Amino acid sequence: MNAAKRLEIFRRLHEDNPDPKTELGYTTPFELLVAVTLSAQSTDVGVNKATARLFPVANTPHAIYALGVEGLSEYIKTIGLYNSKARNVIEACRLLIERHGGEVPQSREALEALPGVGRKTANVVLNTAFRQPTMAVDTHIFRVSNRTGIAPGKTVLEVEKKLLKFVPKDYLLDAHHWLILHGRYVCQARKPRCGSCRIEDLCEFKQKTSDD
């Protein structure tokens, strides 16, 4: 795919959704960090239901740490792997308090030093909370990048690096959200909705569907 096609793709995505947002509910960087940590192998809808119960009661490192693993588990037990996630969040809260004064750090190294926080989670926090030009490649972004030809790659890291290289700079900060939403609602895994796709004419996917 050439640069002109990529530019037009992101121009259209921006035109349709000028201010894209994550579908996870949050009001602070810490709430976002917790929500993204809980979202592994879970849906945003499921996480939002849990955090809607949790955050009014505890939404700071000190408050969640005070709940303890068992206390936190009661709020998030509807989420998959909630026991291990509760342990990770509690330990992350301890480290945030001890090392960062209860604040969420704005560096990848510091974020990835927290339990339950890998490269993808760190990228989400850096991009969404702190507006850094990072690319959190999840299953949707990986699929869309390969299927459309925007940034094909065999690994998540390869796709991430290509997106950072190829996405036009004016659109880089929001590209993560556009690609996730496009993959979630249009360029779906089993049956892409090519008939209602805004970038269908620019997409390099060979097996396009005729209906939406």
Model-derived regions, located:
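Catalytic cores of DNA base-excision repair glycosylases
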Residues: 2-212
